[in-house]
């Protein structure tokens, strides 16, 4: 059993208590149309999306705590959607938990299913040791990783949540040409 499954019952109340939910919603500030939330956990963003929301998480224990009609238990490295399905693809505090080799196929999939905008709120390099401890990150994301996965990065920043997480906005490279 993995840590996410064990923590599922306490995860959402703890995140609300520490103010993470408010920080997390910053990824939606420029979203439009349909939104895919990769690594959605208990789908805290679902009620803040005016259009169609689809949440994907591999952990059924997290999804059973979520509310919303469009929740999918699936591996983010093999998203079960056709190319260019979603207007906006978001992810918060998920990618930084993975090693770069595990992240790469997920980043590629996020670009594949997106038509317009990708927004992530994740620990981004460089990150001080103290801030890295706040994120529980295995390794902060490097902007070059995003570009290598087919993203055209439009903006990096601001840092939020004690400066430990950075909002990154990108487009799939096919669209940015």
Please provide the spans of the model-predicted regions:
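C-terminal lobe and adjacent flexible extensions of AdoMet/dcAdoMet transferase-like proteins
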Residues: 169-177
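A conserved beta-strand element that flanks and buttresses the S-adenosyl-L-methionine
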Residues: 90
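A short glycine-rich, Lys/Arg-flanked "PGG" loop and its adjoining helix->strand segment in the class I
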Residues: 104-116
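C-terminal alpha-helical "lid/dimerization" subdomain adjacent to the S-adenosyl-L-methionine
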Residues: 119-167
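Short catalytic micro-motifs in class I SAM-dependent methyltransferases
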Residues: 93-94
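Conserved class I S-adenosyl-L-methionine
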Residues: 1-31, 44, 127-129
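Helix-capping/helix-break motifs at membrane-protein junctions
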Residues: 99-100
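Class I SAM-dependent methyltransferase SAM/SAH-binding core
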Residues: 36, 41-78
């Amino acid at each position: 059993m993995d840590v996410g499954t064990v923590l599922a019952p306490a995860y959402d109340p703890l995140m609300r208590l520490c103010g993470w939910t408010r920080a997390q919603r910053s990824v939606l500030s420029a979203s439009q149309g349909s939104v895919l939330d990769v690594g959605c956990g208990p789908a805290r963003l679902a009620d803040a999306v005016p259009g169609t929301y689809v949440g994907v998480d591999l952990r059924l224990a997290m999804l059973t705590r979520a509310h919303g009609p469009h929740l999918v238990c699936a591996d983010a490295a093999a998203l079960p959607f056709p190319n260019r399905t979603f207007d906006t693809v978001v992810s918060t505090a998920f990618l930084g938990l993975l090693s770069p080799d595990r992240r790469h196929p997920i980043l590629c999939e996020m670009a594949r299913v997106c038509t317009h905008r990708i927004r992530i709120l994740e620990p981004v390099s460089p990150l001080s040791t103290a801030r890295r401890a706040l994120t529980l990150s295995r390794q902060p994301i490097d902007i070059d990783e995003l570009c290598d996965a087919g993203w055209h990065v439009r903006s990096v920043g601001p840092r939020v949540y004690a400066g430990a997480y950075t909002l990154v906005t990108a487009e799939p490279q096919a669209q940015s040409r």
